Structures are given as structure tokens and as C-alpha cells.
From Swiss-Prot:
Function: Adapter protein that associates with PIDD1 and the caspase CASP2 to form the PIDDosome, a complex that activates CASP2 and triggers apoptosis. Also recruits CASP2 to the TNFR-1 signaling complex through its interaction with RIPK1 and TRADD and may play a role in the tumor necrosis factor-mediated signaling pathway.
Example GO BP: DNA damage response, signal transduction by p53 class mediator
CDD domains xref list: CARD_RAIDD, Death_RAIDD
InterPro entries referenced in this protein's UniProt entry, alphabetically: CARD, CARD_RAIDD, CRADD, CRADD_Death, DEATH-like_dom_sf, Death_dom
Domain notes: The Death domain mediates the interaction with PIDD1 and the formation of a complex composed of 5 PIDD1 and 7 CRADD proteins which in turn probably recruit 7 CASP2 to form the PIDDosome. The Death domain mediates a direct interaction with the Death domain of RIPK1. The CARD domain mediates a direct interaction with CASP2.
This protein's GO CC annotations: cytoplasm; endopeptidase complex; nucleus
Protein name according to UniProt: Death domain-containing protein CRADD
Biological source species: Pongo abelii (Sumatran orangutan)
Locations listed in the record: Cytoplasm; Nucleus
Key word Membrane present: no
Length: 199
């Protein structure tokens, strides 16, 4: 999920909690679309109040990949006023992006291109243990991470390279420098790492 969308959920957290969004079809829709796992749904339903259920859902959503926010909007069919409020807050966040959210000095054709194997290798050299939350925010799963670790048990850099190559294969044209930049910011890793990849 993009940093901007996470910020919107954070800002509207209490308002969303007051709406008790989990009482309708929201959870089922998010489960059906693959945003929530069966365990997530059980964990949310185990909460004792509607407010707690909604708060837990809001805690889980940011780590559920790039489509989580839009799918969450789609799930709010029964709450059109909430959906409009979220869309409006998102538009305001877009027009109000701080300078750090833009990659200065990088041409748009590069931002919209996918990183090469060599560039992924450079990123892997610079990323520390935070590589796991980064690839999760880009839409990979814990299972993907487990497989990368199992394939390269003694070489962390190879684990990281394989994870980013999986991301590039899975998301195709959407696996761009721009989405990588958003993923780094989402987990508060310095996005200037990308500039080193482009040197």
C-alpha cells in the first residue's frame, strides 16, 4: 500500500472505527479478493466489539499489498458515505504530497520502467533486514519470503535478489521504480536508495 494511502487510513482511523465497517460484507469481500487470509478474518471476528474489529482490520490492511486500498474502497458498497470520505482524503493527500514523496531529478520514463537484474542486485547490496517489510509492501507474501530464504539459506543478498525478481515477474509493467519508491517510503526506508541503483 502506498504511503499516501496509509496516511489516509491513519488520519481517518477513529472516524472509520466509529462506523463499525466490519459488520457488513466488507470482510467477506476482502477475503474473496485475496486481501485478507482466512486467519485474518477469524482473528478480526474474534474481537469482542465492532470498534476493535474495525481497528484490527485497519492495522492489517497496510501490509496487504498495492491493491489493498482500492479493494477496501470497493468493499464499502454498503457505506457509500465512508467511501466518498476516503476518496476525498486520498485526493487531498495527492495534491498535498511533500517534496520527499516525489523522486526529484529522475525522468518519468525511468520512473515508469522496471529495474534490471543489475539494478536489483545493487538494491539488494544496500538493503538490510528491512528487505522483508519492503517486499511485503510491494505485494509479495510471507510464503514468497519463506521460499526465497529456503532457496538461499546462507546468502541473504541472494534471498533479496530473488524476492525482487519474483516481484518484477508477478507484477510485470506495474513493477516500476515508482512503485518501488512508494514501497520503500511505506516502510520508512530512505527512498534515495533508488538513486544509487540508477548511477
Amino acid at each position: 500500500m502506498e504511503a499516501r494511502d496509509k496516511q489516509v487510513l491513519r488520519l481517518l482511523r477513529l472516524e472509520l472505527g466509529a462506523e463499525v465497517l466490519v459488520e457488513g460484507l466488507v470482510l467477506q469481500y476482502l477475503y474473496q479478493e485475496g486481501i485478507l487470509t482466512e486467519n485474518h478474518v477469524q482473528e478480526i471476528n474474534a474481537q469482542t466489539t465492532g470498534l476493535r474489529k474495525t481497528m484490527l482490520l485497519l492495522d492489517i490492511l497496510p501490509s496487504r499489498g498495492p491493491k489493498a486500498f482500492d479493494t477496501f474502497l470497493d468493499s464499502l458498497q454498503e457505506f457509500p458515505w465512508v467511501r466518498e470520505k476516503l476518496k476525498k482524503a486520498r485526493e487531498e493527500a495527492m495534491t498535498d504530497l511533500p517534496a520527499g514523496d516525489r523522486l526529484t531529478g529522475i525522468p518519468s520514463h525511468i520512473l515508469n520502467s522496471s529495474p534490471s537484474d543489475r539494478q536489483i542486485n545493487q538494491l539488494a547490496q544496500r538493503l538490510g533486514p528491512e528487505w522483508e517489510p519492503v517486499v511485503l509492501s510491494l505485494g509479495l507474501s510471507q510464503t514468497d519470503i519463506y521460499r526465497c530464504k529456503a532457496n538461499h539459506p546462507h546468502n541473504v543478498q541472494s534471498q533479496v535478489v530473488e524476492a525482487f525478481i519474483r516481484w518484477r515477474q508477478r507484477f510485470g509493467k506495474q513493477a516500476t521504480f515508482q512503485s518501488l519508491h512508494n514501497g520503500l517510503r511505506a516502510v520508512e526506508v530512505d527512498p534515495s536508495l533508488l538513486l544509487h541503483m540508477l548511477e
